[in-house]
Amino acid sequence: MKRIEVLLLGILAVAVGLFGCYYFLVHERIDKVGPEFTVEEKLLEISVKDPEEVLMRGIKAIDDRDGDVTDSILVESIYGINSNQETTVTYAAFDNAGNVSKIQRQVRYKDYEPPRFEAYTTLCFAGGKKFDLLDYVGARDVLEGDIRRRVHATLVSDTENINAEANHEVRLQVTNSLGDTAELTIPVLVYSPDWYNASIKLSENLIYLERGERFNPRNYLETFVVRGDPIDISAAVPSDVSVEVENEVDTEVPGVYVVTFILSKSVNSVTHSGIAKLIVVVE
């Protein structure tokens, strides 16, 4: 009986030993090491207009078993932007065993600008009708283009309802894919329908100017609509149309300004007037 037990224990010991050897050999054959990166330029300088392929410049990946796996490199993320217009790009590379290696480097967009807001109409509305301000404002980004769907609007004036007849102040906010957030507080006028019975169309409704840039507000007048008839005022305002322009824009002082236009025309002894506001951001 004891001999049988000893024999069984011996067989078990041999089996465990053989399994250990097999596991060791198999385990050693499994590739658990990812590729290694080499980067020629620690800081890559590019333009926002460059294609994404430019981000691959000067970066390679070599695997100890598969060799050159540079073709497997992809951009995993681009995030963050500092005052030097530098962002962090994360790269990932893969070998044939599915191992993944990652590396980060700084990329500087030499012509980067934060997102800018747009207004698709003059922000002057006749009271008595509900409207959604986000239908009339948006934002553009130098990298992503149209990002209007990310714009948020918050009423910051004492008025409680954007549809109420009043001079409102609204803060716009938008964030691009880099995490860069732009904010702008703008005026929104909701007037009594009895005040104005004509409309003014501007060529632009929200503009950005560089400090010291020359500015003539009349250059933005486009059309004056009276009783449904459009009057072209882009080149010159007809003599039978009166123009009032309230302009306090100082391009030497950064800030947000508003130019107010009021146009009037008499038809059959009835005066028809319209109002429009141009928002000017001096950077």
Predicted regions and their residues:
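A broadly tuned "polar low-complexity/structure-edge" signature
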Residues: P193-D194, E213, P217, L221, ...
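Compositionally biased, intrinsically disordered low-complexity regions enriched in proline and serine
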Residues: Y23-F24, G80, A92, K110, ...
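Hydrophobic alpha-helical membrane-insertion segments, chiefly the h-region
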Residues: V14-F24
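N-terminal membrane-anchoring alpha-helices
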Residues: E5-V6, Y23-V26
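Serine/threonine-rich, repeat-prone extracellular segments and beta-strand-based repeat modules
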Residues: M1-L12, D64-R105, E144-V190, R227-E283
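Solvent-exposed, low-complexity, repeat-rich "mucin-like" stalks and linkers
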Residues: L25-D66, E113-D146, Y196-S234
